[in-house]
Amino acid sequence: NNNARLMFGDGTQLVVKP
């Protein structure tokens, strides 16, 4: 998909949809 995904060390996932 076109989403930008960042995975943090604590396991939290941030998904950014433009």
From Swiss-Prot:
Signal peptide, first to last residue: none
Keywords linked to the UniProt accession: Adaptive immunity, Cell membrane, Immunity, Membrane
Single GO biological process annotation from the record: adaptive immune response
Localization terms from the record: Cell membrane
Membrane keyword on record: yes
GO cellular component, one term: plasma membrane
Subunit relationships: Alpha-beta TR is a heterodimer composed of an alpha and beta chain; disulfide-linked. The alpha-beta TR is associated with the transmembrane signaling CD3 coreceptor proteins to form the TR-CD3 (TcR or TCR). The assembly of alpha-beta TR heterodimers with CD3 occurs in the endoplasmic reticulum where a single alpha-beta TR heterodimer associates with one CD3D-CD3E heterodimer, one CD3G-CD3E heterodimer and one CD247 homodimer forming a stable octameric structure. CD3D-CD3E and CD3G-CD3E heterodimers preferentially associate with TR alpha and TR beta chains, respectively.
Job of this protein: J region of the variable domain of T cell receptor (TR) beta chain that participates in the antigen recognition. Alpha-beta T cell receptors are antigen specific receptors which are essential to the immune response and are present on the cell surface of T lymphocytes. Recognize peptide-major histocompatibility (MH) (pMH) complexes that are displayed by antigen presenting cells (APC), a prerequisite for efficient T cell adaptive immunity against pathogens.
Name of the featured protein: T cell receptor alpha joining 31
Species for this entry: Homo sapiens (Human)
